[in-house]
């Protein structure tokens, strides 16, 4: 099953690259490594390579996206995460807009402690040239976890580097998470970008019956890799 999935992912990636060059869509592939794979700032996998595919298309003013990530878990059971999303921005003032997004993601966790589950979410952000506040509603169907994330982020460029610091607080049915993040990226050749993210994550669980994370985490998470945009 895992071999067939890897072959399918390779074929899909090749088809996406050809399709993106001949159609008005955006597409990207990336590969890297993470010390902890996070979903809503909860640890779903440890010390894993990550390969991803993203495809986007704008139609009638709405941005549609398809995203997938694949992790070969060390235990031998692979993990994959696939999502569909749609978003639209509404201009309020010349340099101020409201961004609304909604999506659904299927998480094949590859972990005995965390069952496979489907997440439905919706996000609203107040986009501007300064700080961007946002709120995201979350509902995990099989895990029976629901709640919201509130956060604020800032995006800016300096000396050819792109920076995106963010602070988040997430409240779910049985968990609270606090996160401080810094993402950095830089174009290194043509359509090839290098990226990294460092985050401090602190979890606070209100139950000992944990089925939504590997463990209650308090520490640093590092992620890095390369991304090719078509």
Language model region names:
Residues 33-37, 59, 68-74, 90, ...:
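Transmembrane beta-strands of outer-membrane beta-barrel pores
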Residues 1-28, 229-230:
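Cleavable N-terminal export/targeting peptides
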Residues 39-47, 71-81, 107-117, 138-148, ...:
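Solvent-exposed loop/turn segments connecting transmembrane beta-strands
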Residues 162-205, 227:
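Outer membrane beta-barrel transmembrane domains
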